[in-house]
């Protein structure tokens, strides 16, 4: 039997009246079931709840056993990057579009969530990616004002990191190094570095393969490469990826889950690697990933 829950956090951005109605219903239902309920401050304000315990996303992560995210996959991604730093399980109620990460139907949420709260659920540990944008110079004089040290920029992603130019439809040149060994150079519109979770997101649109969520692998998918030999590449999740730029790389960016964007300066390189943190995503007991793909991607039924 899985661990049961005592303290439950409710979060998600109050985008519309339907999402807020789900937040409102969940809060009052969980309180009637005698759970300790913590509501994200934005939600509590939007619902005008009184005598309610509110907290920031980080505080919910540290104080709750379970976080319920109401919204779409974008809401889940934004919350998950922070919640993954804490020992908390996460489940989603789909108030978005596709809903790969948000399992529960808002029309049947009480019934489905009741079983989960009894300990009837499946747990998946989804790994994250981290990136550093740092100087590519091997030696920098820290006291030399003519050669100042540029602070490292960092980012985290559940789905993917995307290297891209600021200018739309603009080809860039870069090298890819894997575990300190040269792998390939490329002229393209960019590169997608995706987790198995992200293999059904932007990577899929660029022709990348679908990876099962618990596979320990990282996916590299070229974006409109200027060569027929460029193909998606799947590597071990423990690999370190380094993106290097021979020429002045004006206005290059690294996008993390399309929500955080880091700028790449001249004489900088990008390092991407598996994070030490995991997202503890839980599902109803009857969750089957292949069935999820059938439903969400509209795959046809058996031909014979």
UniProtKB/Swiss-Prot annotation:
NAD(+) binds at residues 73-74, 159-160, 170, 187, 189, 200-205, 259. One of its GO terms (molecular function) is ATP binding. The keyword Transport does not apply. Its EC number is 2.7.1.23. GO terms for biological process: NAD metabolic process; NADP biosynthetic process. Pfam families: NAD_kinase, NAD_kinase_C. The active site is at 73 (proton acceptor). Involved in the regulation of the intracellular balance of NAD and NADP, and is a key enzyme in the biosynthesis of NADP. Catalyzes specifically the phosphorylation on 2'-hydroxyl of the adenosine moiety of NAD to yield NADP. This is NAD kinase.
